[in-house]
Amino acid sequence: EYYQKLGYALQKNKKYAEAIDAYLKADTLKPDNIWNNRHLAICYRLNRNYQAALSYYKKVEEATPEDTNVIFHIGSCLAELGQYEEAANYFFKLDFIESNCIKAWRGIGWCSFISRKYEQAMKYYEKIIEQKPLAIDYMNAGHVAWTMGDIQKATALYGKSITANGNRERFLEMFRKDKEALLKQGIQEEDIPLMLDLL
């Protein structure tokens, strides 16, 4: 218990690497404790070690298969690791367990987009836009519309993203982070500044 408490105190102070060390010591003394495994998963995820986080989330999932937070974070870790098909399956499971789950729809939308399932991606982004869209939802829907060849719809969605962001600079910052994803979907690099000029 001492190492769990120490780990938790370190975790609360955002000292994730040190918290992991304490939790691992607790795990040596008392293996496969669900609480400990959950906190190891959280710290590894916050430290961007998605593979390690995934292995601990999977241990927690074995004990609590219907835990929606665990399902969501497994899907998120898989997506971060580029395992989009498997990630989408977890987001679909989350959507099944928790109706009208916007964070599941976001996961399905992004994984579908990256997996070139554009109609499915657009279906989920449109569901989000009907409910409680964020600036990123409009932007991602714009990406999908663009890759589907609908420039008019893409510019309208990007425009809504700029409005939701409050300013163009924040939108451009988000947009630049997705440049590689757009190129992988077949958008030509020279078309990106042309699209941005339309906005």
Residue positions per predicted region:
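TPR/TPR-like (Sel1-like) alpha-helical repeat modules
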Residues: 130, 143-170, 196-197
